[in-house]
From Swiss-Prot:
Task of the protein: Precursor of the egg-yolk proteins that are sources of nutrients during embryonic development.
Protein name: Vitellogenin-2
GO cellular component: extracellular region
Organism: Periplaneta americana (American cockroach)
Primary localization: secreted
Assigned keywords, A-Z: Disulfide bond, Glycoprotein, Secreted, Signal, Storage protein
Region Disordered, annotated ranges: 322-424, 1192-1239, 1729-1788
Transmembrane segments: none
Residue pairs linked by disulfide bridges in the UniProt entry: C1520-C1664
Signal peptide: 1-16
A single GO molecular function term of this UniProt record: nutrient reservoir activity
Amino acid sequence: MMWKTLLCCLLAVSAAALDGWEPGKRYEYHVRGRTLTALHEVANQYSGFRFKGKLVIEPHTPSVLRGQLKDTYHMTVHRMLPDGWDQKFEERESNWERVGMKNKPFEVHVGNEFQFNKLIVTEDTPVWETNMIKGVLSQIQVNLKEVGPDPRDEQEDRLRKIFKVHESSVTGRCEVLYDITPITKFNMLPQPLVEIEEENVNVLQVMKTQNFTDCKKLPSYVHGFYNFHNVFPAQNKAGFMSRSQQTRTIVSRNKETGRFTIRSSVTFHEVVLKPELFNSQQGISVSRMNVTLEEIKSQQHIPPPRPPKDVGDLVYRYSAETGEPSQRDSAYALESNSDSSSSSSSSSSEENAANSRHRSSSSSSSSRSSEEMRDSKKHPRASTTESQPRNSRSRRSLQNSKRSINMYNDSSSSSSSSSSEEYLLPRPHIENAPNIPFMPYFVGNQGSKIGEVDPEKIVLLARTISSELQEPDTMVKKNILSRFSILTNLVRAASFSQLEEATKRLYYRVERADNGDESKLDAWKAYRDSVAQAGTPAALKMVHTWIRKEYIKDEEAAKVVAVIPHAADTPTDNYIAYFFEMVKDPVVHGEKYLNSSAVLAFSKLLRLAAVDSEAVRRYPVHVFGRMVPKNFSARVKEYIEYFANKLKNAVKDKDSHKIQVYTRALGNTGHADIIRHFEPYLVGRESVSTHERVTMVFCLDEFVKTQPSVAQYILLRLFENVGETQEIRVAALYLLMKTDVSAELFQRLAEYTKFDKNHQVVSAVQSAIRSAAKVEGPYKKETAKNAQAAVKILSSKPYDDSYSKSFILNNYRREIDVGYSRLYNQIGSRDSFMPKSVFYKLVNIIDGDRDDQAKFGGAVSSVRDVIDFIRQQFKKDDSQDELENSKYAEDDDIWDLREIANLLEMEEENVDPLEGNVHYDYFGAQRFFTLNKTSFEFREELKKYFKKPQITNINKLYNRMELKVGYPNVMGVPFFFTFKRPTLVKLTAKTFIMPLKPCDHGKPHKFPRIFNVTSDVSFVYSFDMHSHMGVVAPFNKKEYVTGIQRKHMIQIPLNVSVHVNLDKNKVAADFKPYYEDNFKVAEARGIPFTTVHDIKSLVPYVEAEHTSYIRVRPSKAYEGNFGKSVGMVYHYNFETDQQFFDYKWFSSNYFLHYPNVAFYYGWEAQPVFYYDFKLYLDSHNSPAKTVQLKASYDNRYTQPEEEEETRQHSKIRRPRSASRKHRRSRHEERAPLENLEVSDTETQREELYDIVLPAVRAGRLYYASVSVAFKGEENVYSKYEVEGALASSQVNEHISTMLRAHSNDAERKHQYAHVRVNVTMPQVPVIDYRKALEFDPTSKIQCEVHFGDTPEKKSKVYFQGKFERTDERKKFVAESDMAQLCSAQQNNKNYLLPACRNVTEEASKLDKYFFKVKYENLSEKCRNRTYKAYSYLRHYFFPYITENVYPDERKTDSVEVQVQFNEEINAVNVSVKAPILNVEFTDVRVYNKYARALFSLNPRYPLLSQVAKTAFPQYYEPTCVVDYSKVNTFDNRTYEHDMLNDWVEVMFHKPRSKIYKQVSVSAKQAHSKMVLKVLRGDEVKFEMKQPRDSSSSPELKMNDKVIEYERSPAFIHYKHELIAVAYALPSKALHLDLLNDSLVFVYDGERVMLHAGNHYRNQVRGLCGTFDGEPSTDFKAPQNCHVRDVEDLILAYTLVRDLDRSRLRDENICVREDVQLVNLTNHRHAEKSGIRPYDIDDDSSSSSSSSSSSSSSSSSSKSNSTSSSSSESNESALPRGENKLHRAQQPSRNCHMHLHRIVTHNGKQCISKLALTECAPLCREESHTTKTEAFVCFPPGPTADHYTKLVRKGVSPDFSRKTDIVNLRVTIPSRCVSKI
């Protein structure tokens, strides 16, 4: 019975096989094909070839066919095809050339589903011929298993079949959609594919559509698409590239026998792409193969192939030449159950879910209707993946990665599985170049590499590049960057021995920087950079050899190594292992810069190749299989362990540089294991600085990308720990925003803005959510929607821009699916106005994928320390190092600064050492530098230039981007696409600094104040964009290419001479062209082309003999000159095939971009056309040879009684000027450089001062001038000069300005303009808002403008303006809520609290303006320009504008303008009455807050101050107020105080740097009056007392000398230096400005308002708070602890001798600032996410404990205490160390922990109010003490459960407001030691 069954099966198989091929017959087919490439949307200019031949098939057995492909010819096509790629050709046999095929017989084995499972050819058949045979056979492989068994059945619904199968073809083994339909002869008439004469047949049309997204085998080569998460270039839809393949086969079926006959088959394979990724015009590569039955004959018995060679199924076969065959095992195979192509980390649940979704979505159903199938064919992009939300891109990309990997698992065919190893290439050896398929150089020689690389060719090409680099003018013409790309390709194909030989020929060592052969040096550098960019194993070994031989070292070697992660093409496990050994090499380890660069480069490569699941896009895993084996995760962890141990040793040695480097290295890996290595430091088990902890958080950035869900959990724990430092929390937030944040999580974050006390955190959350909500583009739509759900929840409180902020600004262009995004993050600083951490990133968005183009980031531990250290190096005079003895007069109530500090028991704060880091993209690589104090020693670095000229020689060639794709087309020949951005940066300079004024005697370390700088500079920047697509014809070593090359070059060769005089604030610079002859300044070329190129040629495509440029029309040439008027003539040439210049495109792509973005993306959406632009400096026709730039600045104070002396230059003194004993004569300060002496502008300056000074009488004077002159050898041919002076007065409330501009050009045209402006703005009340409302703040402006060619022909414009406050505005302010609040405060005698200050400011704002303009002799040109400006405004404000062209009264030679704001100053009406028309702008909204600040004038503030105050409302003018009964601190915390009966310290400043004077401000109240004393150092004392009567101003003394200031300002000097200015305000209050100390006092006898500069931040103590940006820290006592009550704060700062301050020593009253830390993970989450907990055996405590038992009911026993503590030990907050991580450094510090203890007392759950000391796990108690501690108790219920859970999670609750306190005695360990 079994034999019968087997026989039936064999007969069925035989019958199935014979259904298509009749035994004894010979089938002859005519084969025709073509493959063409073109920019078809630009022009129908094609390059490619045609193919024809004859295919003969004879059935040998029921399952074996024998065949032969013979009479094969090809013909080159390189011409215009007006009808497109399918244009018919005239058959001319003379153009056909024979294809060098063997034409040997082959054998095909047919499977049971009509599939060709095996192809056998002769051994001498080359691979390329085998692939072409496979391409032909793919046309006649048709699966007809679904066709009904009855051949006579002609019903259409039974013959029509739609189904899917996986089928092999030359393009891959992929899913194929079959659509079989009957077709009549009538339907075949319009397009007769084949003539069918038989009558007794049914004709079927078989349509096959190949789905490249679902493949078991997909022969393809991909490199460089790492950042393109939506791009799988070999699949159907790959972002900017799409690929499709369809086959139409005509099959006849005999009605009698049921036998099928393939009559005709034609396959179309199309690749459509945007050649430069973002073009609006696309290119195409199309292939068509047509097989048509010509005749059926009797069999002629084709012989079998001898000797036979099995070449597998029909899938394209690679040509393997070199490699390591032993490595081709299952460990490197890609299987469906693997995590990814390279990932070594565990699969997350998210990944598993993605896989299951993929499996369910990819299963096909044959029941789908034919209409649906047709619909899917019509809309191939509407796939399941594309229909998913865009915000799930990370999941989708991971799903697609899995899908690509699963292509290699063919479970349906045993033959396919068995040949999987043969399908992939052997892995490259470390000394050999990898065999890269599809790329021309590797397959162009009969399917193999074009011979062995001759080192002589490398040497010749490098020297050619070098020689052309010496002539930058010809760089673009000679295609240097194209040659560099060719050189890189040669190096990629070379073995190590060949590279070694080339090195011997090219290496050139320069003994002296100024004495070397530049040509030889540039040749070496070109070769060096090509090896760095090659990315092959041989290139890596070559780089290592160079380092060991010291051919490259230090920074040069660091730059080369930094490129490796991006350049590496095949980073196999052996490649990684070799790189790791190189990192550990002592030579590498000992090189400065190189050691850190190598570590960081290796760690990044480790992530890209072995951790990240996206490697399928970056590396050729479809060629070589996995880059690393499946079990490589263990090796990865070994590498990570190495870095972790290095980090541990660095922490032990307190080496900040190594700590940051190895932290960054661990972060680069992006592996889950780094969490357990960072955790001991982040949770405080090991002591590191705050900056180093912040660096660890930021270094989780790559982990966020590899495992976003796990990272989100960890970052959320860090952020939500309110006891953590603000820097850690903000850093965690910024990384958290890079994960997939849901709407719920956005809302959860938004809630923190309502209750979080830390302003830095709140500000960061606000800005991050608001920015995310405004992101545009379809790919961020979901993120924006989620963020928008949380915007309304945010707190409405505004925060200064100096706080932590996150901004995302993007621009998206829907028509081309391209955009860009700019991300800026900053972390605010406690001690400075400037942020302590910044990060900027410019991202290109192409089809939803993000590619980082520019990146910069930096962080420092203290901004103030950096600024002070730099200023210390360049400051003019030394400050006193030590405080001198007090110079004050005897006063029982006053102490010197040292005594005040001792009296207050002032403690020094622990300050972390200065450290930081900077990272940025640099020459195609990412660089990371650490900073410390020596990093800012600029003075010492600059002094090198004093000794001898310093030579700079930078010559760097690199690729900013390189993308490569290759796969076979239907003809079996390789298709390839490459996109490169080669870039050249060449900078040579010889610089020397010559001091002209020697350093002060005894101070040689000071930087000179007067010096010259000379430098010969040559800078060349060039970059190309090369986009090439084509096909390779292996049989004739040709490639048929279509491409675009854009070339750009900028050259700046200059001789620079600069004179700097810091004493006089003057600078002069001469810029002279380096070359005397004409030279090219800039060039830009765009060349679309087609070519037929010899692969062996080293000539760039655009220079090849058979290259044709694509020009859609005859080119037009333009040329011209400009610059004659200035004396420097520039000549330009422009050639293009465009009909006209599209200004609209230019403006939309350049002017509307931000400058930095336009630099990168000015080319987006640019049409593809030919252009050639050149710009020259025409030196021969330029009389001017030198450009001279001069600038000067001056500011000073002048006094009324010194006006006459001012003109004689006698007593006017500038603030911050040197004392007289250090001043030099004018002769000594003169610059000695010939023709470069700074012109004496004192005469001009005094002229302007004489003009502006009378209007103000006394006040501050400012002067600035800038001039540009174009000079010849002797004459000045043109000069342009602008100078101005400004005087502002506190006496008569005037501001006077004078501007003068003059120009004389080379054509003797003289232009001048004089502008004089006088502004009268009264001093408005500052203290009482009622007085401000009653005061008339009306201001006036008068302006006079003269301009023209000569004074006789001058035009005049007179301008008068008046600014008023309307009654409506006055009423609005008076009735506002803020005014009511202020009234209530004033009733309590508090006049200067924030509400009153704000309403007083609002009361003085002006809302109605009137201007009248008169003019004389205004030229028509000027009138026309004015009207054009109005036209732009009219267009912009179109909805709001009304014009009256027939006014009742016309103005003559005048214009009247009236501006009226509404009461809230958020809308404006403007009325203009002009001679030709009247215009009304109605209800124009003023949405922008800066525009409102600019236009809503306030007499108290200048315009720029108003804008700055809007950006920084709190810290532009930081203010502290001590009012009658309340204090408002610098950080805006308000608290009430009783009368200050004793002297109390208001502000005590003790700077960390010596460049600032120490300051003390103290106050005392008596009988409702306040006395104020200010100490400035130990030499100056100011005293302010209440006025003698109500009509007088307060009394002011300096060192007991009365200062008169009521009638005129007092200019106060000390030791010949102006130190202060005092004057009276309208309210009789005193305004005292300490100029050099940035302190301003407003004092009226009862209260004081103090404005302080931002350099005081976080360096003051007292009633005014800490000034660190956080109101919560304002109650900080001198002992650096925090009190809760105002009484304790005042006690802490009361200046009374022998005062009992013991209360402040109680830790419960004065609480130390401590950071409460939490564990990052718990056991459950660690197991779920694959993160190993930190191992105690690794010399650290465990991250979690297994004990979680609850405490017993005993109240105070030792056992109870111990039990309850152990139950919580694994998840509690831990103590801080040296930088607040640990209180003391004890030998057993790892055994001590601080935990909240939980006990049960009287049936209640009690939690210790403070964290108590406990012994850590694996430690034991050696001694203990018994103490009484405060516990907070809760009855059983939800509240108790809530706090218990918080404590167990590691959160330290705030019990400060709890009243249910119980004191319990507990046992606390005093010493813990390890059990091990």
